[in-house]
Amino acid sequence: MSLIYRLRKSKQPHFIQGVYDYIGEMKPFVKRVRKPHLLLPMLLFKSIEWGIYRWYKTPIRRFYGVKGNELIYMITNACNDRCPKCGIWERPEPQDQHLLVMHFINCLKRLHHNLYQVTLTGGEPLIFKKDVMLIAEEAKKLNVPMVIVTNARFLDEAFLTRYKELGHILVISVDSVEREKWNEFRGRKNFDIVMPKILLAKQILGDQLRIQSVLSKESAEEIPKVKEWCKQHNIQHNIQFNQDFGGTWTNTKTEEVNYDNDTPCAARKNICVYPNGDVVKCFDHRRIPLAKEPLGNIAKQDIIEILCTKRSTEVSKIMKSCNLPCKNMSCNKPQTLLFN
């Protein structure tokens, strides 16, 4: 199923627009039905499905039904740590290019009927803690689950207590639980500061806390220790393969892509926003044909208008057969496969 319906034109009759939408959906569908004797019943079922999605709550189309998309906001490139696995912190956005939080909240409001989750990442999201909490409060009002991926340096009791009340998920990046390696992997000597904050987060958040580790040649011996530590503290743990974000870490020799070409990348359902408001389908977006430039910018355009462009739809179609290494990133995996 394609992502969107065409936007209604203000001067176009409502009925005529519906006819255009119907024909535009059915023509490509009919071409995909290989067995002639199944054409009429399949067309009937497709028409019923079309009617439900055409008139239910929102004009944006779903991939697999209601709440089929994830909205991911890289709120900043800036970071207080200097992790060698990542080079994002080397390119902090200028202050005058940082998106005003209300632009993102407006985007969230426009899309919330379609979202199963909103995720905030970085850089370090909690550098903008006030903005993060505004988004968390709005997500709660809109009944959209939220996830923050953080290094935990800026966590405090007040933030954690309110976050717990909102019912959202917190994911903390941990690649070692030993002081020396921790400080090496973080590029900062902050083990004794951050570890107590992680334990405080567990105490307050309980099952709303997750730990995520990056598997690379450098961290391979540390990850089993992190996994065991999480088991001892009853914290769900996820391992993500190393990706090229401009860092110096290298992939393990045994690393393999877990998806074949027949399994569509989940990122085609993603809606990703950069710190300046640029919209892409995936943070490796520019490696995809037709995607060398952003699809639009939510500070200048309505998000639905951006998603309704032909290029946005074509990029999503291309991603059905995309098999780049970023397919193994957490944001591109089905949620049921992430934590154990």
Q: Which residues are covered by each model-predicted region?
A:
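Conserved C-terminal portion of the radical SAM core fold
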Residues: 112-121, 140-147, 168-174, 192-254, ...
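Flexible mid-to-C-terminal extensions adjoining Fe-S/redox cofactors in radical SAM and related proteins
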Residues: 3-7, 19, 62-63, 67, ...
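Residues immediately within or flanking Cys/His clusters that coordinate Zn2+
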Residues: 72, 76, 80, 262, ...
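Conserved alpha-helical substructure of the radical SAM core
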Residues: 17-20, 25, 32, 38-169, ...
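Short, well-ordered alpha-helical microsegments
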Residues: 128-129, 155-157, 219-223, 280
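A short acidic, helix-capping loop that chelates divalent metal ions and anchors anionic groups
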Residues: 92-94, 178-185, 249-250
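Short loop/turn motifs at secondary-structure junctions and domain boundaries
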Residues: 64-65, 260-265
